[in-house]
C-alpha cells in the first residue's frame, strides 16, 4: 500500500547524497527532488523487540528495549530481519528493471526511524544513496565528445531506418481537409470525397489542392562545397535527406525534416513550408500521422509516429524514473495483535477477490445478453462512488429527480386526482380549446344539461344555481406537451366510472379528419355552493356532471377540482335563462 510521503519526508536530517541531474530539461521532472523517495506501507509487520533492536544497531545508540508480557521471544536475528526488510523493499520498488539501479543510483545502506501514528507505530527503513562521483574537466570533455559521436551515429542510423517508408504514402483527415504525404516526395492538402471502395480518401476535383512542401533529392557535397554527382544507390547510402536534423525533447530523441517549395501563400506571398517530426512509438504496428497543425500563416507542423525508429535504442522513450522506497512496517506488541493483523489482511484480500468475482460475473452476464462471449477488461472509472464507463446501471438513489412540475403531476396522478392534474396542466400550458355550441343546446360553451342557470366565469362568487360549463378538447400533441399518456387517460376513465358516471359520455375521444385523436369533456368553471365548489376570486372550479333530462339537477361526480388563474371580470353579464343569449368568455384572463 502506497501513501503520500509528506509525513516521512520531514526526515531531512539524514545524510542523503545528491543525485545526477537529467541530461535535458523535462517538465515532468522535479528538479528539487533528487534523489527521489516513495513511502510504502508494507502488508507485513515487525515485533516490537526486533524493531528496537534494529534501531539500536542502525543508530549505534543504546536504547532500553521495553519489556512486554506478550512480546516476541526474539528468535529472529537482526541480520535476518534486516535482510528480509531490504529484500522486500527492493522487490516492491523495482520489479521491471532487473539489476538496474533505481533512479540511476544504488543505496549504500539503510537506516531506521520510528514513526508514531496513534494508535499505531511503524518502523521505516530509509535507504542512504551514494553521491555521484565528482567529474573533473577532462572527464566532462570526454563525456561531451562521446555524446557528440552518439548523436551523429543515431542521426545516420535513424534516417537509414526511415528509408523503409520510400514508395509509401500516409493519409490523414482533419475536418474539411485531407492530407497525403509520400515519403521523399511531397505533402498535399486537399478536400476529399467519400471513397466508395473504402480506400484512401479521394480528391475532390471541384476544389483546389495545396502543396505544403516538396522534398529535395539527396545529394553529397565535396569539401569545397561543390556538388558531386553519384549513382542513386551510393547516394542513398552516403547521406540522409537534406534539411534534416536530430532533436531531443523530454529526454527523447526524434528526427526533423523541413520541406519547402509549397504552393505560394496568398497572405504572405511566400511558398508554404512544413516541418515533419518522426517520433518512435513502440506501441504501434505501422507508421501513422499523429496530427497536422498550421502553427503560423502558411507554415505547418506534422508529427509522424513510427515503430521503425524504435529499432535504435537512442530513439526509445525514456524509462520512468522510479523513486527509492521507504518501507514502513507496523510494530506489533503481542501474538494476539499479530493474529488480529493477519485476520484483517485476510479479510481485505477476500473482499477484493469477491469484488473482482462479482465484476467478472456481471461482465459474463452482460456478454451473454448481448450475444458476445467477450469479457469486459475495462472496469470503468469511479467518480464520487459511481462507476463510469463500465456498463453499470445507476441505482435509484443516484438517478436525478424529475423537474418540480413533473413531480407534482406524478404525485397528483398517483393520489388519484387525475382530473385535477389534467386540468391544471392544461390551463398552465394553455392547450384547452373552446368550441362553441353543443348539438343538444343552442347556448355556446355550455354543457347541454348543466343546471338551472348559467353565468360568465369570474362574474361573482358563491351564487347558488349558477354554473358555467366549458367544453374542453385536448389533442394528442397537447397530451405529449403535458407529459401525459394513454395510461393516464385510461386511469381517468376509471375515476369517472368509479364516481358512478359514464366515461364515454363525460370523456369522449374521436379521430378528426387529419387522423389526430382528440379527447373532449365538460368542466364547470364557475362553481356552486350547493355542490360544495365555491368559486373564489381569481379561482376556477372544475366539476364533472352527468347528462340529465331537461330541468333536472346536475349530479356532481368526484371531488371539486380547483385551479388558480388571473383575476378578471367576465364581460358577458347577460341572464343565463334567456334563450339565445350569448356570453363572452375571455381565455386570456384565465
Swiss-Prot record:
Amino acids binding a mannooligosaccharide derivative: 176-177, 189, 266, 272, 294, 300
Read off the InterPro entries from this record. Man6P_isomerase_rcpt-bd_dom_sf (IPR009011), MRH_dom (IPR044865), OS-9-like (IPR045149), OS9-like_dom (IPR012913)
- List where this protein forms a coiled coil: none
Keyword Endoplasmic reticulum, does the record have it? yes
Which residues get glycosylated?
136
Q: Name one GO cellular component term.
A: endoplasmic reticulum membrane
BP GO terms, sorted: endoplasmic reticulum unfolded protein response; retrograde protein transport, ER to cytosol
Q: How does it sit in the membrane?
A: Peripheral membrane protein
- Superkingdom in the source lineage: Eukaryota
GO molecular-function annotation terms?
carbohydrate binding
Q: Where is this motif: Prevents secretion from ER?
A: 587-590
Q: Which residue stretches does the UniProt record annotate as biased composition, category Basic residues?
A: 446-455
**Disulfide feature:** 169-182, 265-298, 280-310
Q: Name one Pfam family in it.
A: PRKCSH
Segments forming domain MRH: 167-312
Q: Subcellular localization, per the record?
A: Endoplasmic reticulum membrane
Share what the entry says about its subunit structure, partners included. Answer: Interacts with missfolded ER lumenal proteins.
Output the PANTHER family linked to this UniProt entry: ENDOPLASMIC RETICULUM LECTIN 1, OS-9-RELATED
General function of this protein: Lectin involved in the quality control of the secretory pathway. As a member of the endoplasmic reticulum-associated degradation lumenal (ERAD-L) surveillance system, targets misfolded endoplasmic reticulum lumenal glycoproteins for degradation.
The name under which this protein is listed is: Protein OS-9 homolog
Organism from which the protein derives: Neurospora crassa (strain ATCC 24698 / 74-OR23-1A / CBS 708.71 / DSM 1257 / FGSC 987)
